[in-house]
């Protein structure tokens, strides 16, 4: 009887010892409340990718079209905006009067300047039409872009017909449309103005009531409308600026 009890105690001791050795080896250990476990999503802790040359961010199948510099995130460093253009041969066309035209679309790459290089913040490769689009009886609008007051401004000039511009600001991890301004002209005479502040949900319409009087100075009838909008338009989500619907309130 005593011998049987001895063998039983010996077996229990052997099993306990095996468990202790396994725990000390670091395998199959149950973490305590104070144990910090590694994240199962390494992307969340991955460091940002920096590149020394902004043009290194241009994807295959695109070339640099133009660019500008300025501070977009209020850190005092010169950020970079690149306009890129596709290179597909199938997008070239023969025009009756203008000859061979490149109709590849254009897009934007936005980079923040960091210590040690540039970081990709936003990219939209084909949101703009070609600079060689057909403008009908008049030439197509000319697109320019620049940085002012920590915002990115996209400016369309359309000669005697006026101009319009979109104003984007970096917020909520994207560039959101916070403003729009359009001047619709007849030569040197301004006919209508649309001025929108999407941050305050305010739209101001101005109509020149002296538009048909060449001798009179411009005099505008002003109407201000407040509107509702849940979310702001993000630059990364715009597929085509030519088809962009701002969903503005009607000026009845």
Regions found by a protein language model. Name each.
Residues 15-17:
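C-terminal motif of bacterial Sec signal peptides marking the signal peptidase cleavage site
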Residues 72-84, 146-156:
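Acidic/hydrophobic-patterned starts of short beta strands in beta-sheet-rich repeat architectures
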Residues 2-9, 19-23:
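Sec-dependent signal peptide recognition
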Residues 19-28, 142-252:
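Acidic, small-residue rich beta-repeat scaffolds with periodic aromatic anchors
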Residues 58-66, 125-140, 162:
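Repeat-based blade/solenoid architectures
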Residues 91-124, 168-170:
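Beta-propeller blade repeat segments, especially FG-GAP/WD-type strand-to-loop junctions
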Residues 52-56, 125-135, 187-202:
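Surface-exposed loop and turn segments in beta-propeller and other repeat-based domains
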